[in-house]
Amino acid sequence: MPKRLMPTRDNLRRSHGALNASENDIAGVELMLYLIRASDVIREEIYGALRRDTGLTEGKFALLMILYDISEPVPLVELSVRIGVSSSTTSIMVTRMLQTEEPLVAKTVDPVDARSALISLTPAGRRLLESAMLPHFNRVSDFAKTLSSAERETMIALLKKLVAGH
């Protein structure tokens, strides 16, 4: 991924000057631009490598991790909520994981509500996920090593605060 050229604070002052933007507003714009850039870098370096190594997208990895963590069949709707995507998106992911040579998930009818599907991890899904977890964890850990432990904790607290109301 080519490195995105980020505007300087002076560039932002010039471009937002006509709006009578305060220094705090300009800093907010710069913050959002760097958060977007950080997200792009994480997606490429962490999830791009995961996809190249395993064929798993960020969404499929999240879905498999939820199933792995819960260790029992989960209603499709609950998976959607936990991943943060629509039921139709989750349904498409599940369908694609059912269509692999060795299906990564199993889909059964909920015995309590026949209109609902339950999704569970297959042995093939578990093997793929377990083989991916250590390299993925190491990539994430290596990426975060740029920051000290204290900086990481501060950033976590600030990001939680930033997203709490949204």
Predicted regions and their residues:
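Residues within the DNA-recognition helix of helix-turn-helix
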Residues: 93-96, 158
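N-terminal helix-turn-helix DNA-binding core of bacterial DNA-binding proteins
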Residues: 26, 44-86
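Short, locally clustered residues in the helix-turn-helix/winged-helix DNA-binding domain
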Residues: 36, 40, 65-71, 133, ...
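N-terminal leader segment of winged-helix/HTH proteins
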Residues: 1-54
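Exposed, interaction-prone assembly regions rather than primary DNA-binding/catalytic cores
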Residues: 150-166
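Pre-recognition alpha-helix immediately N-terminal to the DNA-recognition helix
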Residues: 30, 34, 45, 62-65, ...
